[in-house]
Structure formats: C-alpha cells, structure tokens
A protein has these predicted regions:
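Pyridoxal 5′-phosphate
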Residues: 1-236
Length: 236
C-alpha cells in the first residue's frame, strides 16, 4: 500500500499523483491519496484503469470542512469497489445487517450500507454536496490559477526579507499554503507570538504549530534526534 498526501498542509507543496500512482501500480501496490489539504484548490480525478492505464487512484480521502462553507461536514472516502472484499463491516452496527436470527446473521451486500453503521450524517452530507457544488461552479482550474498567482507573489516578496524564512522549496508547485519562521537576532520568534501579531495587529488569520506533521516539521527546521529529545523532555 502506498498512501501519500496530494499536497502538504504545511508547505503546500503538491505531489505528482500521476507519476506516483503509476509507479505504485507498476509494483503491484495500491495508490491511496489524502486530499485533506488539496481538495479546496485542485481538481480531484480518480482516473481509469482502462486500456492499461496505471495512473488511476484506488482511493482518496477528503475533509470537506476545509472547503468554503464546509465546517460541520463529514469526511469523505472515495474508493474502488474491489477494495471492499471483506463481507464483515469494519464497524458492525445498525443498518449493516440484512438478516438476523437466533442462530445466524447476514451482513448487507451493498458496500454503502455495510460500511456505514447507524444513522448517517444526513444534513451534514447534504452540506458537503453543496460545498463541492460551489467549488465546481467557480471552477477548479480558475481557483488553481488564482491561488497560484497569490502564493507566487507572496513568496517572491517574503523570500527577499532577511528575517523571514519560508519553509520548503520555493520553486516546487504548491497550493496557497505557506509556512515560515521569523528571525530576531540569532533566534526565532515564538510561533504563537507571531500568530497573535498577525491576527490582532494586521487582521491576518494564521495558525502556529506543526499542523499534524511533526516528523515533516523536524526535517524542515533541521531538528536532529538529539535536539528532538531535548524538546521532548522539556514538554513532558
């Protein structure tokens, strides 16, 4: 199994899903993609395995709450039917059983029923549909082009400032997501202090921290294992 992010939620750097999926399938692996960060900005195409094409995706995971209007929506899994070969649901519960007696039971043959126990998030799912409808109405290509222009302009200015260190490659294709640290003398300003200034003084919404990507943060900041253990001891 190969499971990767379509784009980083830390640096915004985009992965070549076509090349990676092709390589995975050449070696008999499944191609699974996390679109949590990328979904609001880029087209999502599962592709087809017809005519020997190997660039298709076996599954994608999406967090619609990151799209415009998306807070409160459920997560979405889109996967090829052949992956659901287990006749027993991952979480048995209401709606997953088609027939039951005192001696035996049968689970539902339809994947959607078998793998979603209990009452589904009906209103929230309708909302998820609406946010994707909005994205399609604007046009993923339009969004992608406009966001790319924004982030290129920002990086071009920020990378010239001696006290701003934009993390990750400045040349790679990326979403309009940028992580940076601010130097003051021979040290960096605390991230939450920078966030407070951006929000309270300049009205710029931002987030401090490693965004659920601790190991990647170690690499970007050049934190070796010894320094990591020092941080761990202080935190704990």
């Amino acid at each position: 199994i190969g499971s990767f992010s379509a784009a980083s939620n830390v640096t915004g750097i985009i992965t070549d899903t076509v090349a990676v999926s092709t390589l995975l399938h050449q070696h008999g692996a499944l191609s699974l993609w996390d679109y949590a960060a990328a979904a609001p900005y880029v087209p999502i195409d599962m592709g087809s395995s017809a005519d020997g094409n190997l660039a298709y995706k076996d599954a994608v995971f999406i967090s619609p709450h990151k799209l415009i209007g998306g807070p409160g929506t459920p997560g979405v899994l889109v996967a090829r039917r052949e992956l659901f070969s287990n006749r027993v649901p991952d979480v048995p519960g209401g709606g997953t059983v088609r027939y039951v007696s005192t001696a035996e039971h049968d689970y539902h043959p339809e994947i959607e029923h078998r793998e979603e126990a209990g009452t589904p998030a009906i209103i929230e799912s309708i909302r998820a549909g609406l946010v994707f409808q909005l994205k399609e109405a604007v046009g993923p290509e339009v969004i992608e082009a406009r966001e790319s222009a924004f982030v290129r302009a920002a990086i071009a200015r920020w990378q010239q400032h001696p006290h701003i260190n934009v993390l990750g490659s400045h040349e790679a294709d990326r979403l309009s997501i940028v992580s940076f640290v601010i130097r003051h003398g021979d040290r960096y300003l605390h991230h939450n202090y920078v966030v407070a200034l951006l929000n309270d003084v300049f009205g710029i919404q931002s987030r401090g921290g490693c965004s659920c990507a601790g190991p990647y943060g170690h690499r970007l900041l050049g934190i070796d294992i010894e320094r990591s253990h020092e941080f761990q001891r202080v935190i704990n």
